[in-house]
Amino acid sequence: MNILIIGGGGVVGQKLGAKLLERGTLDGKAISKLVLADIVDPAPMDGAETTTCDIADPASVAACITPETDVIFLLAAIVSAHAEQDFDLGYKINLMGTWNVLERARALGTVPKVVFTSSIAVYGGEAKDPLGDWSQMNSQGSYGVQKAMGELLVNDFSRKGFVDGRGFRLPTISVRPGKPNRAASSFMSSILREPLNGQEAICPVGKDYLHYYLSPRKCVENLIKGAEIAKADLGHNVCMQMPGKMWSIGQLVDAMEKVAGPEPLKLIRWESQPEIEAIVKGWRYDIHADKALALGLTADDSFEDNVRYYLEDDKPQA
């Protein structure tokens, strides 16, 4: 089996690549080739090839997706705050990039499997709680609108038999390793990651702010399970909510204290940032993932697990 991860240089892409290599199989078939592709050459990984791919450029996409490509994980995107600030670039990457990948897959005529990552940012506006697979997508930000459009494309290309598609609306992934990015949700990892590493972090919202979370470890497990779901079991809508859990910022901090003690809490500064609050307070959190749960995908049992996974998998060693 030949697998391509577009967005293979990112946190989830790197972890997904490593897990697939560890398994050696996908859907019961041996992985013969794994390619990590991104806008810049991803970090090298033993057992995988790396290449550059600009999904906004059809020629670049065509060079990456070959007739031998069996499975495409489409993870690449520009994130929420960036897409909000740069309207044109958001649509160029998040909408037209998705179109370019699907159109290349269609042109091959081989019906590759496409696993698309959407986002809980598709929810918003006047849709009624609780939200889930059949809720109206009514994002109040450009990033969510672009992801909603991507879901519709994946559904239509799948309906026409051009690809074997499936899409998953990711919860906010926390605790993410690395450095803060331009996502409005970036602080939802940094207020834990930085203090766990002995560094100060700023929280721009109050402790009562509620959100919907999943750990990187569970996200990767779910993407692999999602790729292995039989096409017949997906139904007419091949895109669905990935399971997560709702917690407040205060509960996240309490979980960190339970796992790592009281010292990291002293490194959090609570400072309101209206430009971030304006985005994240438009997001929704009362979200249910009934379809994915029935298909075998899972959420973390507690946020203490999320903290432990970061310490086990990602915390830099002194």
Each model region followed by its residue ranges:
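NAD(P)H-binding glycine-rich loop region in Rossmannoid oxidoreductase-like domains
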Residues: I55-I93
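Alpha-helical substrate-binding/gating segment
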Residues: M188-I202, L210-C239
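N-terminal Rossmann NAD(P)H-binding glycine-rich loop of SDR-like oxidoreductase domains
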Residues: I3-L26
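Glycine-rich "substrate-gating" loop/helix at the edge of Rossmann-like oxidoreductase active sites
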Residues: P171-S185, V205-K218
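Conserved beta-loop-beta element that borders a ligand/cofactor-binding pocket
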Residues: E151-P177
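Mid/C-terminal beta-alpha module of Rossmann-like enzyme folds, strongest
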Residues: K218, N222-E277
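Conserved Rossmann-fold NAD(P)-dependent oxidoreductase catalytic core, especially the SDR/UDP-sugar
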Residues: W99-G141
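Amphipathic terminal alpha-helices
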Residues: S272, R284-A294, D301-A318
